[in-house]
Structure formats: structure tokens, C-alpha cells
Amino acid sequence: MSMTVSEKILARASGKDRVEAGEIVMADIDVAMTHDLTGPLSVESFRAIGEDRVWDPEKIVVIFDHQVPADSIEAAQNHMIMRDFVEEQGIRNFYDVREGVCHQVLPEKGHVVPGEVVVGTDSHTCTHGALGAFATGIGSTDMAMVFATGKLWFRVPETLRFDVRGKLREHVYAKDVILNIIGRVGADGATYMACEFAGETVAEMSVSDRMVLSNMAIEMGGKTGIVEPDEKTLNYVRRRSGKPWRVFKTDPDAPSLSVMEVDVSDLEPQVACPHNVDNVKPVTEVEGTEIDQVFLGSCTNGRLSDLRDAAAILKNRKVSDSVRMLVIPASREVYRRALDEGLIEIFVDAGALVCNPCCGPCLGGHVGLVGPGEVSLSTSNRNFRGRQGSPEAEVYLSSAAVAAASAVKGSITHPGSLK
């Protein structure tokens, strides 16, 4: 029987020859990730079910990124809980406050390879599907069961493949592609589906750009966002991981597969407008909207390629006096390479604030929140009310290039319009 890549991975993990969409399976977990914000509840739930030892400390990864450094006594206590837990359980894959955002650090450190089942107590765990894994977010109670047993049940999802074709125009990036797709599909248009990204345009993208697509699959309700592994994928994991991998491909006649054709050849930069991610418009329709803050970072667009795109625009230019620009590299490795390439110097000279690698204002709780009536333009993935501070603020989402150009202009701007 023909299957999709997601079905093949879940079949492998559950010890079956085949699975079908809608079937309930009990799958072995290859990687279990938690962080400083959701980890303590996972630990509490683990204790509550009477367990003393995790099933396999080598398959558990703990990363501090949400409240880094601790911004309150409660956050400091959460950090202490997790530090004690990793020491008690012998968890070696522990990344304290210095490393960066979990969805950048996890693949960077070689913890994800094709063919794996990856779970994390964060909704954007779907990011790691860009490496050909079945990756999805779970709750802290589910993670407690994973800690205890190394297994978790799944309902096998149907697959919606986005066949993306066409050459991207100047100033158009992966972020514009995924925003356009979400705008067309809707915030709940792919609920509990495996969103598969394919086609010639995706094949031309770097692994970092593919991560942008997978990262935002959850914003249309997707269970995961997955890209079939190719040589780019394997080159990425070869440099970072010594783990074995398995390459699975979708059979074109798989019964649960539906396909949506996406032509991006005429696409222009996109902006998600308040207060929903699927409220997407071309940048030209919102150009001139005044902004108070620009946030360049997050697990969506805080990678080196994003910093390069922004720095190319900011070089020999200044951030508008009316704008606060925050630059938050997604990881220490990204920060270090940006330093080596002179990108940090460009940001500082332009008048941006460069912060330590962390989630920043994305979760609305740390580093650079916005106040009532203020407008933020962000390269992150969500713009719900209160997402970056006050529920009376407005948050727009864009690519790094649009964010940088807008920081210079003081209002939402097409990068091509800067003189």
C-alpha cells in the first residue's frame, strides 16, 4: 500500500509495515525536547505518576530559551527545577541560558535527523520536519508519559502537500511564501494534517529557508510541517550529527494525500496584519503604516541568512529615530558567525539593539514588549492580541528584509523602495 512520508515514519516508529490516516498508533519517540517554560510542569507531571527515572536520558534534550536570562524569581526557580532534574536524571543534552532558541539549537547540535519522531513541549516543534522528521508539539502531561515510557500515541494524519513552483522575485523569501499559503488556507485550514512542502521552489531553498515553512505549519493548524530529505538535508545533518537516519519519500498515489498547487512566480513581499496570522496582505497594501518597534529574530527568522538579509539593507543606513529595533540571533552559533561576518557591527552602527540569543518578545513575556497602542513589526510567527505585550498593541509579521527596510523608514516598507 502506498503511503506518505509521515505515514512511513509513524509506521516505522510503531513497528508496523503500514499505517493509514485516522489510525491510532503507539510510536517510539526518538527525540523528546522541553524548555524552561514548559519543562517544570512536565517534571511535576512525571513525579505525579510515580516515576523515578526517565526511560532514556540520551534521547531527552532540555534547552533554556524563553526567559533567558531569568526575568523574575519564578523564572529563576523554573531554571533551578530543570537544572536539578537534568543532574538527577543524567541528561547530558542540556543547554543552559547561553545557547539560544530551542528550534535552532536542536538541529544545530545534531539532535534531529531524517526519519525520526521528534516531540517537544512547544507548538513550533513542527520546525524540525524540515529535516525529514515527523516533528510535533505536545503538552507537558504527554511529555511526562514520554519521559516515563519513551512512547506516545498518535492519530495518523492526512497529508496536504503544497507543490510550490516558480522562481522567487527579488525581495521575496520563504517567509513570504508561507504567509501567502496561510493566507489562502486559513488559520484552521490544515487542522491536524501533515503539511508537506514540495516542488521546485522548495528544492531550491536552503535548509534554513525550509525551516521557515515547517515552523509555521502550526499556524494553519498542521500537526507537522515536513519536507522530504534531499542532498541538502543530508549535507546539513552530516556536518552536525553522528546518528543514523532513514530517508522516506511520499508515494504519489498515497490514498491520504491531497495536493495544493502554489505558484510564487509573481509573489511580492507579504505581511500578516493584526490580529490573525491568516490576515495576510501584500506589503504594498499596508505600506506607510507607522511602527514603534521592529523585532528581528525568533525560531522563524533569527537565523544567519535572516541577519544577512537585514544587514544588507541596514548597511550605511540608520534605524529611524521613531523606531526601536531589536536584533536577537536565534543561537550562540548564529551570533558568533554574525560577529565574524561583521553583521553585528552593521546592526549596532545602524542603531539597533542586539540582544542575547533567546525567544525575546515573541512570547509576550520577556525582552522588548510593546505597550498599549504601539505597533510592532516582527519576523516571528504569531500576532494574536497580547502576543508581544499589551493586548491593545498591534503586531504585523514579515520577512527580515521587510522588517529592516521598515526600521529605516519608520513605517512598513517594501525593501525595493529604499533609495
UniProtKB/Swiss-Prot annotation:
Alphabetized GO MF terms: 3-isopropylmalate dehydratase activity; 4 iron, 4 sulfur cluster binding; metal ion binding
Domain of life: Archaea
Cofactor note: Binds 1 [4Fe-4S] cluster per subunit.
Binding site for [4Fe-4S] cluster: C299, C359, C362
UniProt keyword terms in alphabetical order: 4Fe-4S, Amino-acid biosynthesis, Branched-chain amino acid biosynthesis, Iron, Iron-sulfur, Leucine biosynthesis, Lyase, Metal-binding
Pathway(s) the chain acts in: Amino-acid biosynthesis; L-leucine biosynthesis; L-leucine from 3-methyl-2-oxobutanoate: step 2/4
GO annotation, biological process: L-leucine biosynthetic process
Catalyses which reaction(s): (2R,3S)-3-isopropylmalate = (2S)-2-isopropylmalate
Pfam families attached to this UniProt entry: Aconitase
Cofactor(s) in the UniProt record: [4Fe-4S] cluster
Listed SUPFAM superfamilies: Aconitase iron-sulfur domain
EC number: 4.2.1.33
Keyword Metal-binding: yes
Broad EC category: lyase
Alphabetical list of InterPro entries matching this protein: Acnase/IPM_dHydase_lsu_aba_1/3, Acoase/IPM_deHydtase_lsu_aba, Aconitase_4Fe-4S_BS, Aconitase_4Fe-4S_dom, HAcnase/IPMdehydase_lsu_prok, Homoacnase/IPMdehydase_lsu, IPM_dehydratase_rel_enz, IPMI_cat
HAMAP family: LeuC_type2
Oligomer and partners: Heterodimer of LeuC and LeuD.
Similarity comment text for this entry: Belongs to the aconitase/IPM isomerase family. LeuC type 2 subfamily.
Function as written in the Swiss-Prot or TrEMBL entry: Catalyzes the isomerization between 2-isopropylmalate and 3-isopropylmalate, via the formation of 2-isopropylmaleate.
PANTHER family with a match to the protein in the record: HOMOACONITASE, MITOCHONDRIAL-RELATED (PTHR43822), ISOPROPYLMALATE_CITRAMALATE ISOMERASE LARGE SUBUNIT (PTHR43822:SF22)
Protein name: Probable 3-isopropylmalate dehydratase large subunit
